[in-house]
C-alpha cells in the first residue's frame, strides 16, 4: 500500500466523491443480503406455512428492493468512475508538468516509447483500479461481514464450517498476489520496450527505407513482441493454476454445507428455507472470494503502474530556481565564463575543461571545432540545460543561478542543430516563445530569417498547418522558421548552434546578411563547423577536446598558422581546386 500512500495527493482531494460512492455501495451490498432472507420467508412462511396471502406483498417488496438496488448501483458506478477519472486527470497533469521541469540529463537516458507507455497504459491501469478495484475490495469485506452475521443468525454450526474454509482461500489469494505482481511489472516493462521499438521505427522510417532495413526492423520488433507475449503467457499460467484451486476450495465448502445442512434439516434443527437462504448467502460470499483474484490482479497491475509513475514523479529535479531567484524582463547580455568544466555523467571524462572567456553585450562570438570538442556544451551551460561541475558562469556580472529559469531562457534565443517545429501553424511556431507577439512582429522576424518569401508562396501563408516535426517543409525552410522563432523572441543573447547547416550556401549568405542587423546590441554565439558561418565574428574560440586551443579574429587566427589555419585550408582546398584551370589531355 506504500505506493498508493505516495500517490495520495492525486486522489485524496476527491475523497468526498469516493465516500458517496461507498455509501451507495453499502446500500447495494445490504440489499444483496436481503435477497436470501426474502427467499427464506417465501419457502418457510408462504409455501410450507401456507400463508399464501403474503405472496403479493412479498413480491411487491421484492420489486421495491430491486428498484432501490438499481438506483444504488447506478450512483455507485457513476461516482466511482468520477473518482477515478478526476484522480488520473490530476495525476496525468502532474506527470506532464514534471516532465517539463526535468532537466536534459534525464532525457539523455529516457526513451520516448517508455514515457508514452507510462503516461497512457500505466495511468489507465491506475484509473481502472481507483474506479472499480478499490471499491470492490471494500465491497468484498462488507459482503463477507454482513453475510457472516446473517449466517450466524441462521446456524452457528454451519457458519463455523464455512469459516473453516476461509484460511485456505486466504493462503491461495496471498500466494497468488506474491506471484502475479512481479509478472505484471514484467508485462509493463515489456510493453514499454515494444512502444519504444514502434516509436523509433516510425520516427526513423526514412532511414529504415533508405538503407533497406525493413527486415531487420521487423525482426527486432518480433523479438520485443515475443518477449511481451512470453510475459503475458507467464501471467496466464499463474491465473490458470489459481482459478481451479479457488473453485475446488469453494466447491468443497459447498458440498460440506449441503451434507451437514441436510442432516440438520432432517433432525429438525434447521428449516428448509433457512438452509436455502444459508446456501444463497454462501454463494454470495464465495463468489466475491473467488473473484478476489481478479481484484488482486487489478491491484497488482495498479501497484506496478504506480511504481513506474512514481519513478517520474519522484525524480529529483537537477536544475531549479532557488527561493530568491531574480525575475527580470530584460538582461543586457554580458556573458563571462570563469574556469568552467562540464561532465555529462559521473564516470565520463569532462566535456569542457577550465573554459574561460568574456562576451560583452553586442559582441559576436564564434565557436569552432570538430564534433565532440565542446562547442555546443558552452551554449547548453549558458541556458542551464546542464550544470557545470566547476567554475562560474555570469550574465551581467551575476551568476546565472541567481536568475529564474524563465528570466534566463526568455532572454536567450536558441536555434539548435536539429530544428523542431510543432504540428501547428507557421505563425504559432514563430511566436512560440512569445505568444503575445503581433502579426507584424512575426512577419518582421520571418523577413530577417529570409523565410517570408517562401511562406507567402504557401496556400495559407502564415496560417499553413505543418505536419508532425514540420513535415512538408524542406530542411532549409524548417531551419529558417526556427531562426525566425528565435528572432521573434527579441532576446538579449542569441545562440545559433549550427543554425545554417541545413541550408545551401546562397541561403546561408542571405541569412548571415540579415542576421548582421539582428545581432546589433545583442550578444551572439555562433556554433559552426564551417568557417564561412563565423569568420565575421568579433572573436572566434577554437575548441578541441573540451579546451580552448586558440582565440582571436578570423585574420588573427589565420596569421598564427595554427589549428584554425589547418581547418581553413582543409575547407577551402576544394574551392581552390575548382577555381584552378585543369588541363584536359
Swiss-Prot record:
<keyword id="KW-0547">Nucleotide-binding</keyword>
<dbReference type="Pfam" id="PF00005">
    <property type="entry name" value="ABC_tran"/>
</dbReference>
<feature type="transmembrane region" description="Helical">
    <location>
        <begin position="18"/>
        <end position="38"/>
    </location>
</feature>
<keyword id="KW-1003">Cell membrane</keyword>
<feature type="transmembrane region" description="Helical">
    <location>
        <begin position="55"/>
        <end position="75"/>
    </location>
</feature>
<dbReference type="Pfam" id="PF00664">
    <property type="entry name" value="ABC_membrane"/>
</dbReference>
<keyword id="KW-0472">Membrane</keyword>
<dbReference type="InterPro" id="IPR011527">
    <property type="entry name" value="ABC1_TM_dom"/>
</dbReference>
<feature type="binding site">
    <location>
        <begin position="369"/>
        <end position="376"/>
    </location>
    <ligand>
        <name>ATP</name>
    </ligand>
</feature>
<dbReference type="InterPro" id="IPR027417">
    <property type="entry name" value="P-loop_NTPase"/>
</dbReference>
<protein>
    <recommendedName>
        <fullName>Uncharacterized ABC transporter ATP-binding protein YknU</fullName>
    </recommendedName>
</protein>
<dbReference type="GO" id="GO:0055085">
    <property type="term" value="P:transmembrane transport"/>
</dbReference>
<feature type="domain" description="ABC transporter">
    <location>
        <begin position="335"/>
        <end position="570"/>
    </location>
</feature>
<dbReference type="InterPro" id="IPR017871">
    <property type="entry name" value="ABC_transporter-like_CS"/>
</dbReference>
<dbReference type="GO" id="GO:0016887">
    <property type="term" value="F:ATP hydrolysis activity"/>
</dbReference>
<dbReference type="InterPro" id="IPR039421">
    <property type="entry name" value="Type_1_exporter"/>
</dbReference>
<keyword id="KW-0812">Transmembrane</keyword>
<keyword id="KW-0067">ATP-binding</keyword>
<feature type="transmembrane region" description="Helical">
    <location>
        <begin position="238"/>
        <end position="258"/>
    </location>
</feature>
<dbReference type="GO" id="GO:0140359">
    <property type="term" value="F:ABC-type transporter activity"/>
</dbReference>
<feature type="transmembrane region" description="Helical">
    <location>
        <begin position="276"/>
        <end position="296"/>
    </location>
</feature>
<feature type="domain" description="ABC transmembrane type-1">
    <location>
        <begin position="18"/>
        <end position="301"/>
    </location>
</feature>
<dbReference type="InterPro" id="IPR036640">
    <property type="entry name" value="ABC1_TM_sf"/>
</dbReference>
<dbReference type="InterPro" id="IPR003439">
    <property type="entry name" value="ABC_transporter-like_ATP-bd"/>
</dbReference>
<dbReference type="GO" id="GO:0005524">
    <property type="term" value="F:ATP binding"/>
</dbReference>
<dbReference type="GO" id="GO:0005886">
    <property type="term" value="C:plasma membrane"/>
</dbReference>
<comment type="similarity">
    <text>Belongs to the ABC transporter superfamily.</text>
</comment>
<keyword id="KW-1133">Transmembrane helix</keyword>
<dbReference type="GO" id="GO:0034040">
    <property type="term" value="F:ATPase-coupled lipid transmembrane transporter activity"/>
</dbReference>
<feature type="transmembrane region" description="Helical">
    <location>
        <begin position="150"/>
        <end position="170"/>
    </location>
</feature>
<dbReference type="InterPro" id="IPR003593">
    <property type="entry name" value="AAA+_ATPase"/>
</dbReference>
<keyword id="KW-0813">Transport</keyword>
<feature type="transmembrane region" description="Helical">
    <location>
        <begin position="128"/>
        <end position="148"/>
    </location>
</feature>
Amino acid at each position: 500500500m506504500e505506493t498508493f500512500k505516495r500517490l495520495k495527493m492525486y486522489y485524496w482531494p476527491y475523497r468526498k466523491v469516493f465516500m458517496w460512492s461507498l455509501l451507495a455501495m453499502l446500500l447495494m451490498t445490504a440489499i444483496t443480503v436481503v435477497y436470501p432472507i426474502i427467499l427464506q420467508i417465501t419457502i418457510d412462511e408462504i409455501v410450507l406455512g401456507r400463508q399464501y396471502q403474503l405472496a403479493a406483498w412479498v413480491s411487491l417488496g421484492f420489486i421495491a428492493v430491486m428498484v432501490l438496488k438499481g438506483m444504488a448501483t447506478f450512483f455507485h458506478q457513476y461516482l466511482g468512475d468520477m473518482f477515478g477519472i478526476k484522480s488520473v486527470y490530476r495525476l496525468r497533469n502532474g506527470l506532464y508538468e514534471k516532465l517539463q521541469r526535468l532537466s536534459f540529463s534525464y532525457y539523455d537516458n529516457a526513451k520516448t516509447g517508455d514515457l508514452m507507455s507510462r503516461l497512457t497504459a500505466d495511468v489507465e491501469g491506475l484509473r481502472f483500479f481507483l474506479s472499480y478495484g478499490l471499491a470492490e475490495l471494500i465491497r468484498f469485506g462488507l459482503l463477507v461481514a454482513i453475510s457472516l452475521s446473517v449466517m450466524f443468525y441462521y446456524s452457528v454450526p454451519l457458519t463455523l464450517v464455512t469459516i473453516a474454509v476461509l484460511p485456505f482461500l486466504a493462503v491461495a489469494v496471498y500466494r497468488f498476489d506474491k506471484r502475479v505482481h512481479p509478472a505484471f511489472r514484467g508485462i509493463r516493462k515489456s510493453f514499454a520496450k515494444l512502444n519504444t521499438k514502434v516509436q523509433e521505427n516510425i520516427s526513423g522510417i526514412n532511414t529504415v527505407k533508405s538503407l533497406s532495413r525493413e527486415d531487420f526492423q521487423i525482426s527486432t520488433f518480433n523479438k520485443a513482441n515475443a518477449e511481451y507475449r512470453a510475459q503475458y503467457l507467464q501471467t496466464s499460467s499463474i491465473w490458470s493454476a489459481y482459478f481451479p484451486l479457488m473453485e475446488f476450495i469453494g466447491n468443497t465448502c459447498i458440498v460440506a454445507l449441503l451434507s451437514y445442512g441436510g442432516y440438520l434439516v432432517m433432525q429438525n434443527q434447521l428449516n428448509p428455507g433457512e438452509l436455502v437462504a444459508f446456501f444463497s448467502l454462501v454463494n454470495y460470499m464465495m463468489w466475491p472470494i473467488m473473484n478476489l483474484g481478479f481484484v488482486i490482479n487489478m491491484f497488482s497491475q495498479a501497484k506496478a503502474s504506480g511504481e513506474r509513475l512514481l519513478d517520474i514523479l519522484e525524480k529529483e529535479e537537477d536544475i531549479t530556481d532557488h527561493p530568491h531567484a531574480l525575475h527580470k524582463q530584460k538582461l543586457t547580455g554580458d556573458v563571462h565564463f570563469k574556469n568552467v568544466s562540464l561532465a555529462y555523467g559521473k564516470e565520463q571524462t569532462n566535456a569542457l575543461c577550465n573554459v574561460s572567456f568574456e562576451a560583452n553585450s553586442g559582441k559576436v562570438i564564434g565557436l569552432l571545432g570538430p564534433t565532440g570538442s565542446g562547442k555546443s556544451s558552452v551554449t547548453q551551460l549558458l541556458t542551464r540545460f546542464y550544470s557545470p561541475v566547476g567554475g562560474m558562469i555570469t550574465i551581467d556580472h551575476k551568476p546565472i543561478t541567481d536568475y529564474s529559469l524563465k528570466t534566463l531562457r526568455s532572454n536567450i534565443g536558441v536555434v539548435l542543430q536539429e530544428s523542431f517545429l510543432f504540428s501547428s501553424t507557421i505563425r504559432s511556431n514563430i511566436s512560440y516563445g512569445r505568444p503575445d507577439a503581433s502579426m507584424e512582429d512575426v512577419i518582421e522576424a520571418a523577413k530577417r530569417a529570409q523565410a517570408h518569401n517562401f511562406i507567402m508562396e504557401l496556400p495559407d501563408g502564415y496560417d499553413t498547418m505543418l505536419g508532425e516535426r514540420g513535415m512538408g517543409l524542406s530542411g532549409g525552410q524548417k531551419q529558417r522558421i526556427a531562426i525566425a522563432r528565435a528572432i521573434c523572441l527579441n532576446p538579449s543573447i542569441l545562440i545559433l548552434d549550427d543554425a545554417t547547416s541545413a541550408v545551401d550556401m546562397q541561403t546561408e549568405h542571405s541569412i548571415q546578411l540579415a542576421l548582421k542587423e539582428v545581432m546589433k546590441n545583442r550578444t551572439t554565439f555562433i556554433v559552426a563547423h564551417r568557417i564561412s558561418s563565423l569568420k565575421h565574428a568579433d572573436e572566434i574560440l577554437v575548441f578541441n577536446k573540451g579546451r580552448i586551443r586558440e582565440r582571436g579574429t578570423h585574420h588573427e587566427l589565420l596569421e598564427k598558422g595554427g589549428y584554425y589555419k589547418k581547418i581553413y585550408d582543409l575547407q577551402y582546398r576544394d574551392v581552390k581546386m575548382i577555381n584552378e584551370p585543369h588541363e584536359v589531355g
